[in-house]
Swiss-Prot record:
Signal peptide range in chain numbering: none
Entry keyword annotation includes DNA repair: yes
Originating organism: Xylella fastidiosa (strain 9a5c)
Membership in a protein family: Belongs to the RecF family.
Protein name as it appears in the record: DNA replication and repair protein RecF
Length: 364
């Protein structure tokens, strides 16, 4: 899929912009504060139903305006069909209002399922060395887009977990807790299996990509932590054993909501010793592997939005990353404050835009 038109009204520094990106590589150059990141933020907002920079009250609506509007047209192409799609989001101070293909939508998840965007922004490097919730969210994004029933499964587990935690806080009778334990274990085992299988698929992509971009790290696997000792006992037994502790804590201390995954390297003891640049490269390769898996399952590529791609990367690694991106038929939106040396060989296969004072101008 690729965006053919992006319309912004009263969004951040943009008053009124109609922009037409090209398929393939799109470079956006401009000074700090010119609106480059805001442009990618708008695309991200359409694909995730939320901003990666804050809430509406944090300045999404242009100063002096009462509302914002974002519209996007894109071409959707799988192995069989091609069709044009259109979506819009507006906010008038109370709530988001979304439309998809001319129809009002009740839930933003409907829009998110239609437009697949993979974003790398300033905090994305935390995927590798921060809390496990980000890594679970990474797996769940991929499953949400390639397995139609995954959202229902995830919602079911979240609901049952909430009910069990409520019972633990209220010190409810044992019979009620056992019933919820049974349901939690049934759904939790399914959720865990989906995540594990998905990570196994990604592993086949991630290891060659990381080996190519930074061979000195000698990656040899992605380790999955189920959230309990699954190799020793099923979830229902683990919940029974932890029941007294859970009563004491007032919450469920193990299960898929405690799962995690980490890259394993032969040359270093763990991800905690990676430099910021290395962490950025590893994260980028994980995202690219996810995009490739999306193509394998859906027959089309998601949109890649990469903010400040060249920062913290030397010229050699800039070149390697761009080489990989140029090899795939995905639409890629890349921002930077200047034209990095590593990008220059790829201008012939992409388009360059200048962003300044809320305006976007094509350079070549």
């Amino acid at each position: 899929m690729h965006i053919t038109q992006l319309v912004l009204r009263h969004f951040r520094c943009f008053d009124a912009v109609d922009f037409f990106p090209l398929p393939g590589l799109n470079f956006f150059i401009g000074e700090n504060g010119s609106g480059k990141t805001s442009l990618l933020e708008a695309v991200h907002l359409m694909g995730y139903g939320r901003s990666f920079r804050g809430r509406v009250r944090d300045g999404l609506i242009r100063h002096g305006s009462e509302n914002l509007e974002i519209f996007v047209d894109w071409q959707e192409t799988d192995l069989i069909n091609a069709r044009r799609r259109r979506a819009g989001l507006s906010h008038y101070g109370q709530e988001w209002i979304g439309r998809l293909d001319g129809q009002k939508i009740m839930h933003l998840a409907t829009l998110c399922a239609a437009l697949a965007v993979i974003t790398f922004e300033s905090s994305s490097y935390q995927l590798i060395n921060s809390n496990a919730e980000l890594r679970r969210r990474f797996l769940d994004w991929g499953l949400f887009h390639v397995e139609p029933d995954f959202l229902d499964l995830w919602r079911c587990y979240t609901h049952v977990l909430k009910q069990r935690n409520s019972l633990l806080k209220q010190k409810e009778e044992l019979a009620m807790l056992e019933a919820w334990d049974q349901k939690l274990s049934e759904v939790g085992e399914q959720l865990t299996f989906r995540r594990f299988q998905y990570l196994e698929r990604l592993k086949q992509r991630v290891i060659p990509l990381i080996s190519r971009i930074t061979p000195n790290l000698k990656i040899h696997g992605l380790n999955f932590n189920h959230g309990w000792r699954r190799h020793e006992l099923p979830l229902i037994d683990a919940l029974f054993i932890s029941r007294e502790r859970d009563y004491q804590y007032g919450y469920t201390s193990l299960g898929p909501h405690r799962s995690d995954w980490t890259p394993q390297f032969a040359s270093i003891p763990g991800v905690h010793v990676l430099s910021r640049g290395q962490g950025k490269l590893i994260t980028l390769m994980c995202l690219l592997a996810q995009a490739q898996d999306f193509f394998d399952q859906r027959g089309e590529w998601p949109i890649l939005a990469l903010d400040d791609l060249a920062s913290e990367l030397d010229q050699k690694h800039q070149w390697r990353v761009l080489e990989m991106l140029a090899e795939i038929p995905a639409q890629v939106l890349i921002t930077g404050t200047e034209i990095p040396q590593g990008l220059k060989p790829y201008f012939s296969v992409g388009a360059m835009f200048h962003v300044e004072h809320g305006a976007i101008t094509r350079m070549f």
